[in-house]
Amino acid sequence: MGYLELKNVNLDQHLLSRVEELYYNSFPPEERRPWNSVKSLLKREDIRYKIEVIQQNGKFVGFISSWDFGSFCYVEHFAVESSVRGNGIGAAAISQFVAKSQKGVVFEVELPHCGEMAQRRIGFYSRNGFDVHADFEYVQPSYGEGLSSVPMLLMSANMSDDLKISVVAKTILRFVYGVKKD
């Protein structure tokens, strides 16, 4: 597989255009925010949003965008170039990310009945140490006007026993999507 590295990216780096291309190729419109919003988040210093590129032997092969909420990290987007999928890069990147974060890590995933890709994605995260919170009802809010909300599942790894998934979901909804929910 070769040397794999996660590296923070900022607005000045040429790698951001590679991230943007993979972002649009990997996620449907209802599962992504407008790119200008991504760039605005990267400019802000008062929030804990970041994008890390995944590099294999110095070559861009993917990215992880995440939010650090202190007691857990929420991975908003994770994608690996289609040309290198199936070679263990995604598993190695997730393993590195979880180890580096030293806290719980949470993902949203599509419901299994959404198709084979959704089932494969859930299987991938399960094989990599993530638990499905199947009995917790969760809906990803709309990213913007004209876009649908999406029923999802939350998956987590390394979560503290005293951190409830309902609190995690409220935090994500409030700070990532701007939804205030009691």
Positions of predicted regions on the chain:
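Short amphipathic alpha-helix that is part of the acyltransferase structural core
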Residues: 1-37, 151-152, 167-182
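Active-site rim helix/loop that mediates acceptor-substrate recognition in acyltransferases
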Residues: 27-51, 55-56
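Conserved beta-strand in the GNAT
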Residues: 53, 59-68, 72-79
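Conserved acetyl-CoA-binding loop-helix of GNAT-fold acetyltransferases
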Residues: 80, 86-99
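Charged helix-capping and loop-helix junction motifs
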Residues: 91, 118-124
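Conserved GNAT acetyl-CoA-binding A-motif
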Residues: 101-117
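C-terminal "cap" of GNAT-fold acetyltransferases
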Residues: 117-118, 138-182
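Conserved catalytic-core motifs of GNAT/GCN5-like acyltransferases
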Residues: 122, 126-146
